[in-house]
Amino acid sequence: MANGIAVAINTLSSELAAGGARTDGSLVKAALASVSPADILLQPIFNPVGGYASYVVPAAFVLILQQMLLIGASLLTVVALTQPVNGAFASVLGRSVAHLTIYLPALALYFIVLPRFYGFSTLGQPLQLFALASLFVLATSFMGQAAGAWFKHPETPTLIFLGTSLPQLFVTGFSWPREAVPKSMQALGYIFPSDFAIDGIVRINQMGASLWEVVRDWRGLWGLTVIYFALAVMSAFLVRRRQAHG
């Protein structure tokens, strides 16, 4: 927008100055020098490509990772709870560690390799990036397990969570102004880890922020991790108990 305004002003100034031009161009040069004594050079810092894709795609990567893990964790939980395995606490924790281990290469691909391949800004520290991203994966895993405990059919999580993808695109505020989203919808978006993760991961990876500068997102993901872990353990315990008495 700033670039467009600057171009429009310079174009108008040039046209006004050229209105009384001389054959040698001296009047035009003098008028332009008085209107714009210094050349304006606009250089985007966090969006060097200057395109919409470089603004949207890094945030979309986070949402893609969340939706895949939500569906996968829920689906595997539906199947796992049909097996005669005791210990809700250990099983929930074990599955989350497995999800995190499997997702580490995906985090490296989506947050390190692909941004550099597409020429996106990558100013963040990898350790801080992976600290926040790992917490995001754990929160998503626990959420998927908590939800998956109450599904009867393995295909149900795919239908439900895919339907939430498009609303999350708008609620998180990167494809639509957050100020234009109703407060009730914003509050509803906080139940998904991607709401905090998109803001925090993009700020760290693309803008070079530290964990301290995204402490709101860090605390939000910790809160969701604890809440969904408790819900996943309780859900697994209740489902096991219902199966034992059913």
Which residues are covered by each model-predicted region?
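Hydrophobic alpha-helical transmembrane segments of multi-pass membrane transport proteins
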Residues: 43-115
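Peri-membrane helix termini and adjoining interfacial loops of integral membrane proteins
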Residues: 28-39, 106, 191-204
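Juxtamembrane loop-helix boundary motifs flanking transmembrane segments in multi-pass membrane proteins
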Residues: 32, 41, 45, 49, ...
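Transport-system extracytoplasmic interface segments
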Residues: 1-72
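Membrane-spanning alpha-helical segments of multipass transporters and channels
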Residues: 101, 112-113, 121-246
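A generic alpha-helix surface/boundary motif
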Residues: 22-24, 107-108, 141
